[in-house]
Amino acid sequence: MSTPNRYTLPKLERLTSRILIEKLFTGGSKSLPAFPLRIVYMPIEGEHLPAVSLLISVPKKRFKRAVKRNRVKRQIREAYRKHKDCLHESLEASGKKVVIAFLWLDNELHPSAEVEEKVQKLIRLTAEKLA
């Protein structure tokens, strides 16, 4: 009997390890753009890690005010939370684990529907590449 999908983003799924973040951005990672976002991902090994670890970055260079940066991060988190099942199912089938970073590329705010569409596209493309 399958359990219903839980659309949550627990703390365990957030990428906080400085070592993994450094590895993600220094080498061995791949990226896919879907303006105004870019996803950077890297398969990882480790038993104690969740299937997906997530990092969201909105640079201060793009938005000086924290209110705007927080809004964009909230939009990305919400979109990821709604559409992460596709990625989780793909990773469970292949037995892989992955570290993901969403990076904001634009200097302007976008509607939540547009951000959600781009996040969904990037998740789908990443799942296809990792499968």
Predicted segments with their positions:
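Positively charged, solvent-exposed patches that mediate nucleic-acid binding
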Residues: 1-131
